[in-house]
Regions:
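Phosphate/pyrophosphate-binding loops at sites that engage ATP/ADP/AMP, CoA/4′-phosphopantetheine
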Residues: 17-35, 214-226
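Phosphate-binding glycine-rich/basic clefts of nucleotide- and phosphate-handling proteins
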Residues: 15-20, 24, 30-32, 121, ...
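Stable alpha-helical structural segments in soluble proteins, enriched in small hydrophobic residues
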Residues: 21, 25-29, 93-96, 274-282
Length: 286
């Protein structure tokens, strides 16, 4: 399904998009016993407290229709089933721990935004606000401004499809303005699959960004593993991004490099690993 949350101000549009996604997923299942949701933003008791997905929605409409949007969508679609709504970064980290079968994992999903979460040494989600998408990683005065936080140089502009789109013209790739951000990403990914050197430059640049940023993240979390997820990491581009990142870490930060392990899951898990982890969250009572 196609859903453009960041450019739509109508909360009913968002509700309809979420319901459509739920129904689409249900069509592939024999039944729905529970629903787990992975979504960008801050969620408390399954309620949307703050989320860049809905940045265009006016405050009064946000309070009236967005705070309980997932609760309404789930109960209206499936009735009284257990459900859990969790920040997508935390779910990324949980997916990482499940994939690696180990703890102390920083999960980073690069898609519409940058989702970062952390699973501690005991294998638990901490409940911290790991919204690193809005933590500055570039102090240059000319760095891009994030339209939601108002800050410059935020991670979201370096570790998401926004970064690919931003770098495309600098690499000599002109993308049609009529395309959606996700469609623009697909164009670059298609070129990468054809071993286009212009597309390769984009992923190499993001790999360099990531190496320097992971050291900053390490000073905060002291993680042991990093698992990279999301559609930006799909295909040959993701492999090149990871290889570049590892080379920069080894060359410029050997001490940190010896302490951490970077990994990519298999292609399927890169795309849907968060969904699998989210589905494990609700408690089903016998």
């Amino acid at each position: 399904m196609v859903w453009f949350p960041k450019i739509n101000s109508d909360p009913d549009y968002h509700y309809d998009g979420i319901v459509s996604a739920l129904k689409s997923a249900a069509e592939h299942l024999p039944r729905v016993d529970a629903v787990g949701v992975s979504s960008a933003g801050v969620y408390i008791d399954n309620r949307t407290m703050n989320a860049s997905l809905f940045l265009q929605v006016p405050k009064d409409q946000f309070d009236a229709k967005v705070k309980d949007i997932y609760i309404r969508a789930i109960t209206d679609t499936f009735g009284n089933v257990p459900y859990e709504v969790v920040n997508d970064g935390d779910v990324s980290a949980l997916a990482g721990a499940m994939s690696l079968e180990d703890n102390n994992v920083l999960g980073i999903a690069m898609g519409t935004s940058e989702a970062v979460g952390y699973v501690d040494e005991e294998g638990k989600i901490t409940g911290w606000l790991n919204e690193l998408a809005f933590v500055p990683v570039d102090a240059a005065p000319t760095a891009m401004e994030d339209e939601w936080s108002g800050d410059i140089g935020c991670g979201v502009k370096y570790f998401s499809q926004d970064s690919v789109i931003k770098l495309a013209p600098r690499a000599g790739i002109e993308l049609e303005e009529s395309l959606s951000p996700a469609e623009k990403l697909k164009v670059v990914q298609g070129l990468m699959e054809q071993d286009d050197p212009r597309a390769a430059q984009i992923y190499e640049s993001i790999g360099v960004y990531l190496a320097h940023t992971l050291v900053h993240y390490y000073n905060l979390y002291h993680y042991r593993h990093v698992l990279l997820l999301g559609r930006v990491m799909s295909g040959k581009g993701g492999d090149l991004l990871l290889d570049t990142c590892k080379k920069v870490l080894a060359d410029e930060y050997p001490t940190v490099n010896e302490k951490i392990h970077l990994a990519l899951p298999d292609e399927k898990f890169r795309r849907v690993g968060q969904s699998v982890a989210a589905a494990s969250l609700p408690e089903i009572k016998e």
